[in-house]
Amino acid sequence: MALEDRTPGQELGRALRELTAGQEGRPMFVELYGGREAGPGGGIGALELRRAAVETAGCRERFDQREWIASGSEPSWRLEVTGRDMMLNVAGSPAPQRGAHGGLSRSPGAGVSYAASDDPGFVVVFEERRCIDPLSGSLFAYAVEVRSEGRSYSGCAAHNPAMPAP
């Protein structure tokens, strides 16, 4: 089945070249918006690139009940958000920080956010804008900022594709 790159600026093709570094046959995981072309020889028309990575579990990645998975570096950290709580794991910390939240809040032009019910300083804000992981070069549709225990962490996020978009 043929794939036609109709993304702005041929972003899909550019991501393929940059992430695979010219290594023919290197697998790349992508999430995209597009449509199936009708008729004989019809393929897929890619309209928007949502996520692209080579060093990932890709389709095997398990979101389970998680709505969001986010990560960043300096220091290395990972965030998971479910329908009820959020958990921040920072490298070097003795234990992950966990907090129940009251659901997402929308702010016009500022994305969606979650705040821990029992710790108003534990706040997560997801913004729909291109984010490129500085270590892997992977592309994401969401940028994230996490504030916790007086610190701020910035990184990239993936939304569970099996759940409604925020």
Predicted regions and their residues:
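Central antiparallel beta-sheet cores of small beta-barrel/beta-sandwich binding domains
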Residues: 1-8, 66-125
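Short, surface-exposed linear segments at secondary-structure transitions and domain or protein termini
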Residues: 9-15, 104-112, 133-137, 160-166
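Short, compact, well-ordered microdomains
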Residues: 138-161
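Surface-exposed beta-loop interaction hotspot
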Residues: 39-83
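Flexible glycine-rich surface loops and low-complexity tracts that mediate binding to linear polymers
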Residues: 21-45
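Small beta-barrel nucleic-acid-binding modules, principally OB-folds
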Residues: 1-28, 118
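Short, solvent-exposed aromatic-acidic interface loops
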Residues: 52-54, 73, 93-94, 157-164
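Short, solvent-exposed beta-strand/turn "edge" segments of beta-rich domains on protein surfaces
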Residues: 19-23, 131-136
